């Protein structure tokens, strides 16, 4: 009986094995660009951002959190995008975005900080509603929602003024 239990545990662990490149530390590379990428932090079993230099590096470099998770945590179940809570991330930029509120059933505004966060983040009401509801509902609701969004989030944002000609 003990042998059967040990075999079952071994099968479970090896079927969820993390690929070798996901265990490497992120490598910036020798170039000097600042390109936001994602890497898998093996010690915390999570995907995090880093700034890639633009050349070199290693395989632990992904264009999105989703791609990082798919590559390094392929068996882990995830919460559907439209059911995730809005996550502003840990940066402090002021970037108004949209998220789908599964309780109210429509898209609402929130302030994204510019990095991290989750996939329930959209640049427009239409993108949000088309992903989480339907295009027909997006056309019906987004004109009104966008007007409210602009009043709430864009009213006090300083606007750039053109420089006078020299």
From Swiss-Prot:
GO molecular function per UniProt: serine-type endopeptidase inhibitor activity; toxin activity
SUPFAM superfamilies according to UniProt: BPTI-like (SSF57362)
Domain BPTI/Kunitz inhibitor: residue ranges: 22-72, 82-132
UniProt keyword annotation of Endoplasmic reticulum present: no
Any matching Pfam family: Kunitz_BPTI
Entry-linked InterPro entries: Kunitz_BPTI, Kunitz_BPTI_sf, Prtase_inh_Kunz-CS, TFPI/VKTCI-like
Signal peptide region: 1-15
Subcellular location: Secreted
Disulfide bridge partners, by residue number: 22-72, 31-55, 47-68, 82-132, 91-115, 107-128
GO biological process: envenomation resulting in negative regulation of voltage-gated potassium channel activity in another organism
PROSITE patterns linked: BPTI_KUNITZ_1, BPTI_KUNITZ_2
Keywords attached to this entry: Blood coagulation cascade inhibiting toxin, Disulfide bond, Hemostasis impairing toxin, Protease inhibitor, Repeat, Secreted, Serine protease inhibitor, Signal, Toxin
Gene Ontology cellular component terms for the protein in this record: extracellular space
Keyword Disulfide bond tagged: yes
SMART domains: KU
Function: Thrombin-specific inhibitor from tick hemolymph (Ki=20 nM).
Protein name stated in the entry: Amblin
Organism: Amblyomma hebraeum
């Amino acid at each position: 009986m003990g042998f059967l239990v040990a075999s079952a545990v071994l099968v479970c662990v090896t079927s969820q094995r993390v690929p070798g490149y996901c265990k490497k530390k992120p490598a910036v590379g020798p170039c000097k660009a600042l390109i936001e990428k994602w890497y898998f932090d093996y010690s915390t079993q999570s995907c995090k951002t880093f700034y890639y230099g633009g050349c070199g590096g290693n395989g632990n470099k992904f264009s999105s959190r989703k791609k990082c998770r798919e590559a390094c945590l392929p068996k882990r179940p995830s919460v559907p995008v439209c059911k995730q809570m809005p996550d502003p991330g840990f940066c402090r930029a002021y970037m108004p975005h949209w998220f789908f509120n599964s309780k109210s059933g429509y898209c609402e505004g929130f302030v994204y900080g510019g990095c991290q966060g989750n996939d329930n983040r959209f640049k427009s009401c239409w993108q949000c509603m088309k992903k989480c509801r339907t295009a027909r509902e997006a056309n019906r609701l987004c004109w009104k929602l966008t007007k409210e969004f602009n009043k709430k989030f864009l009213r006090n944002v300083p606007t750039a003024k053109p420089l006078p000609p020299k």
